[in-house]
Curated annotation (Swiss-Prot):
SMART domains (alphabetical): BATS, Elp3
Keyword Iron annotated: yes
Amino-acid positions noted as binding [2Fe-2S] cluster in the UniProt annotation, renumbered to this chain: 99, 130, 190, 262
Role of this protein: Catalyzes the conversion of dethiobiotin (DTB) to biotin by the insertion of a sulfur atom into dethiobiotin via a radical-based mechanism.
Gene behind the chain: bioB
Name of this protein: Biotin synthase
Domain of life assignment: Bacteria
Its EC number(s): 2.8.1.6
């Protein structure tokens, strides 16, 4: 099956995909997925909060916003040695990518060298590296790239016409500007959004339209299901229909056929059957480990058991650290399945 990568999608086309009968939509999405990926392989990442809480922004979904009483206290930036220890544990559990998140509006200049040191050390272990630190300027993006960062995550969160219902302290254009800085220095982009925040299907179409018409499709597209945290404004929002979540995955796969589509936040509350439908619809990446920043995530044993039941295996990668300013050269290939790592 030949699939053309397009950047000229229009709203009517994506809306028509969303409105297809569910079996037909899954068939189309699975066909596109198979044209570009091995459907039995899933990329496995681990996400660590290296700086938790105290964020000055007002994102209505976020327990790390200091203005909400969520029980999350502000903590200082972790030491590099602590981060390396967590990365070592993640690799032993089968992760191939290690993501570092900090609850900042944007990093201060004094923080960039500290994060760069974390990136260099994790990269030298043979892991892909990803960071999500808030808004970046061009110089900060360059510094992270020079440290060896592979991916930068900066989500659009929701559709442009629903954005003001969720966030007031950062403009949509601010997010687009950060993505531009990241692309300009050659970093891979990780960009998606959150569903289940009270938006309509039309808003979900709008989010995917914004993503699929970027100058370059994100290399990774995380689709998050809202995790409702007491104390945040969105706590108590009506739950999204699980089939609607699968539709979101399927249309993302069709619209961005070469991107990794990641099951991100909210997976802890998903049944194995729902996750299996998401993999069938084209999801091929998950976060692995008991926490996503400050919210829960399925434990590794559950994920390993699910992979075994579905016949899935972690995606193999090769990380070359020689292209960066590291002492020595690292060629690492993650080849053992998570189940084997657990058995060992």
């Amino acid at each position: 099956m030949s699939v053309v990568v397009r950047h000229d999608w229009d709203r009517k086309e994506l809306q028509a995909l969303f409105d297809l009968p569910f079996p037909e939509l899954l068939h189309r999405a699975a066909s596109v997925h198979r044209a570009h990926f091995d459907p039995a392989q899933v990329q496995v990442s681990t996400l660590l909060s290296v700086k938790t809480g105290g964020c000055p922004e007002d994102c209505a979904y976020c327990p790390q916003a200091q203005r909400y009483d969520t029980g999350v206290s502000a903590q200082k930036l972790m030491e590099t040695e602590e981060v390396v220890a967590k990365a070592r544990q993640a690799k032993a559990a089968g992760a191939s990518r290690f993501c570092m998140g900090a609850a900042w509006r944007s990093p201060k200049e004094r923080d960039i060298p500290k994060v760069a040191a974390m990136i260099r050390e994790v990269k030298a272990m043979g892991l892909e590296t990803c960071a999500t630190l808030g808004m970046l300027d061009a110089g900060q993006a360059r510094a992270l790239k020079d440290a060896g960062l592979d991916y930068y995550n900066h989500n659009l969160d929701t559709a442009p016409d629903y954005y003001d219902s969720i966030i007031h302290t950062r403009q949509y254009q601010d997010r687009l500007n950060t993505l531009e800085h990241v692309r300009d220095v050659g970093l891979k982009t990780c960009c998606g959004g959150i569903v289940g925040m009270g938006e309509t299907r039309e808003h979900r179409v709008g989010l995917l339209l914004a993503l699929a018409t970027l100058p370059a499709h994100p290399d990774s597209v995380p689709i998050n299901q809202l995790v409702q945290v007491p104390g945040t404004p969105l706590h108590g929002t009506q739950q999204l229909d699980p089939f609607e979540f699968v539709r979101m995955i399927a249309v993302a796969r069709i619209a961005m056929p070469k991107s990794m589509v990641r099951l991100s936040a909210g997976r802890e509350a998903m049944s194995d059957e729902l996750q299996a439908l998401c993999f069938l619809a084209g999801a091929n990446s998950i976060f692995y480990g008991e926490k996503l920043l400050t919210t829960g995530n399925p434990d590794t044993e559950r994920d390993q058991a699910l992979f075994q039941r579905l016949g899935l295996r972690p995606m193999q990668i090769t990380v070359d650290a020689a292209e960066h300013d590291h002492p020595g050269t690292v060629h690492a290939e993650i080849t053992r399945s998570a189940a084997c790592e657990h058995a060992a």
